[in-house]
Swiss-Prot record:
It comes from Streptococcus pneumoniae. Belongs to the bacterial solute-binding protein 9 family. Lipoprotein receptor antigen (Lrai) subfamily. Keywords: Cell membrane, Lipoprotein, Manganese, Membrane, Metal-binding, Palmitate, Signal, Transport. Part of the ATP-binding cassette (ABC) transport system PsaABC involved in manganese import. Binds manganese with high affinity and specificity and delivers it to the membrane permease for translocation into the cytoplasm. Also acts as an adhesin which is involved on adherence to extracellular matrix. GO terms for molecular function: metal ion binding. This is Manganese ABC transporter substrate-binding lipoprotein PsaA. A lipid is attached at C21 (S-diacylglycerol cysteine). Mn(2+) binds at H68, H140, E206, D281.
Length: 310
């Protein structure tokens, strides 16, 4: 009996040893690539253009949804906890409103500037109208392509720090990508220079085009200022209509991630048509126009220039 017991004990020990080895091998295999999490589809696309297949990438806020206020899913919590590197926009986008990102990284025991980084670091911040204090920043810095280039450089820097063996790969992709963005930026500046001053105003639902306005010399007007406040009230619509009566703006625009009904009301009451949907807080679904940061910006720039030249 002792002999049988000894054999059984040896068998069990060997079995657990094999399982442990198998688990270890599987774990190592799955962790060969850097695990990266981004808060939204725009950051995910910029990251993908630099990192390619060298990383495992998870984006939290789904395409077409508003990143200002979001409730992370269990899968988001799991991926964030497992992440080697996390990129968020910053400038009060994910940390304003219901502060969903602040709670997420705290619960995942992640440390700022060690595990998670603001892609917007180094951007010249623009504030909401009449404000100039922390918590009142306009977060939509990526709508200026020069800032998109800053995002890309920040993302590449942290990828290289975490994964130095792929440094050359990341740097090569960064150079090609930023050159592409820079070329589009220059084309846009030229296009907007040729629009008559009396027509040059971009009118949107959310007042998210301040960075765009500064970069391309196109003043902006809006129904509400930021998506974390009340949206599309009669008073907000009335204020915009009064402003439009003093202009010769030929076209209105509505963002892909907001309720279009308030802008339809503005269009009806002002007799100014909605020319196109444009992208702000999200890229488009895969396979559609605007399904990358570059293509969404190209779409925006072309549609806005075309609409204002009517």
């Amino acid at each position: 009996m002792k002999k049988i017991a000894s054999v059984l004990a040896l068998f069990v020990a060997l079995l657990f040893g094999l399982l442990a080895c198998s688990k270890g091998t599987s774990s190592k295999s799955s962790s060969d690539k850097l695990k990266v999490v981004t808060t939204n589809s725009i950051l995910a696309d910029i990251t993908k253009n630099i990192a390619g297949d060298k990383i495992e990438l998870h984006s939290i806020v789904p395409v077409g949804q508003d990143p200002h206020e979001y409730e992370p899913l269990p899968e988001d919590v799991k991926k964030t906890s497992q992440a080697d590197l996390i990129f968020y926009n910053g400038i009060n986008l994910e940390t304003g409103g219901n502060a969903w990102f602040t709670k997420l990284v705290k619960n995942a025991n992640k440390v700022e500037n060690k595990d998670y980084f603001a892609a917007s670091d180094g951007v010249e911040v623009i504030y909401l109208e009449g404000q100039n204090q922390a918590g009142k920043e306009d977060p939509h810095a990526w709508l200026n392509l020069e800032n998109g280039i800053i995002y890309a450089k920040n993302i590449a820097k942290q990828l290289i720090a975490k994964d130095p063996k792929n440094k050359d790969f990341y740097e090569k992709n960064l150079a090609a990508y930023t050159e592409k963005l820079s070329k589009l930026d220059q084309e846009a500046k030229q296009a907007f220079n040729n629009i008559p001053a009396e027509k040059k105003m971009i009118v949107t639902s959310e007042g998210c085009f301040k960075y765009f306005s500064k970069a391309y010399g196109v003043p902006s007007a809006y129904i509400w200022e930021i998506n974390t406040e009340v949206e599309g009230t009669p008073e907000q619509i009335k204020t915009l209509l009064e402003k439009l009566r003093q202009t010769k703006v030929p076209s209105l625009f509505v963002e892909s991630s907001v309720d279009e009904r308030p802008m339809k009301t503005v269009s009806k009451d002002s007799n100014i048509p909605i020319f196109a949907k444009i992208f702000t807080d999200s890229i488009a679904k895969e396979g559609e126009e605007g399904d990358s940061y570059y293509s969404m910006m190209k779409w925006n720039l072309e549609k806005i220039a075309e609409g204002l030249n009517k």
